[in-house]
């Protein structure tokens, strides 16, 4: 009996907390609970991104076949990127630690830098200032001036690199997926162990990656101008 009381109290605390955060609502007349607006918003958010993955899937699979490297698709969520799709590369027995649903800061990832390069400079600076900037590895860019020189370089090249800035032993090349305004909320990347990802290999991957970003942008109704 004591166990049942404890369970009811725990459930009540959880429901109260969820009510305060808008995930559920309590009907004052019936005392019954139903889904709140926050939960509905989350459902819509998930469905929207499933749609993006569905539209991008064929291009991502083609990119994986062309390069035999690990392919990622991410979306921006405020100061972070969230991984929403991954295709493991067949070119290495080593598997990236990345996983669908993983969240990382914009500033220390190739995909994040690619996305920030499509933003107005004032917005990119606001993201930097709001981020808890620290060195994930010895290669993470933590100096503000150096970071914005890097963003300017990404704008000029049309792609971004992650030189072991987030994960030691892994190098990435990334490209943003711009919408019709030229702004990006999604990006793709190719990742491989640093030992195989020399500059020459980066240049080999650049063409397939940029073609894929253009094709996904077109599939999503965005820009195809790069």
Give each language-model segment a name.
Residues 26:
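Short beta-strand "wing" residues that participate in macromolecule-binding interfaces
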Residues 140-212:
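Extended hydrophobic
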Residues 22:
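Glycine-centered, phosphate/nucleic-acid-interacting loop/turn motifs that mediate DNA/RNA or nucleotide
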Residues 17-18:
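Basic amphipathic alpha-helical segments that dock to polyanions
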Residues 9:
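Key DNA-contact positions within bacterial/archaeal DNA-binding proteins
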Residues 29-130:
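Amphipathic alpha-helical effector-binding/dimerization core
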Residues 1-6:
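Short, small-residue-biased leader/transition segments that mark boundaries at the very start
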């Amino acid at each position: 009996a004591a166990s049942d009381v404890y369970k009811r109290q725990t459930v009540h605390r959880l429901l109260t907390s969820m009510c305060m955060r808008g995930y559920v609502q309590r009907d004052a007349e019936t005392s019954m609970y139903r889904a709140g607006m926050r939960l509905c918003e989350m459902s819509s958010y998930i469905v929207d991104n499933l749609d993006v993955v569905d539209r991008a899937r064929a291009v991502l699979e083609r990119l994986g076949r062309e390069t035999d490297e690990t392919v990622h698709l991410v979306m921006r969520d405020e100061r972070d990127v969230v991984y929403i799709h991954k295709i493991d590369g067949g070119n290495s027995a080593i598997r990236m630690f990345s996983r669908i649903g993983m969240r990382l800061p914009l500033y220390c990832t190739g995909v994040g830098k690619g996305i920030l390069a499509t933003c107005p400079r004032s917005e990119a600076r606001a993201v930097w200032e709001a981020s808890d900037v620290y060195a994930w590895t010895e290669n993470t860019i933590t100096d503000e001036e150096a970071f914005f020189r890097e963003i300017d370089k990404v704008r000029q090249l049309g792609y971004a690199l992650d030189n072991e800035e987030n994960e030691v032993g892994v190098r990435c090349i990334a490209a943003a997926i711009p919408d019709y305004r030229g702004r990006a909320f999604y990006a793709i990347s190719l990742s491989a162990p640093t030992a195989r990802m020399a500059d020459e290999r980066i240049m080999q991957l650049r063409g397939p990656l940029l073609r894929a970003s253009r094709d996904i942008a077109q599939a999503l109704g965005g820009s195809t101008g790069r």
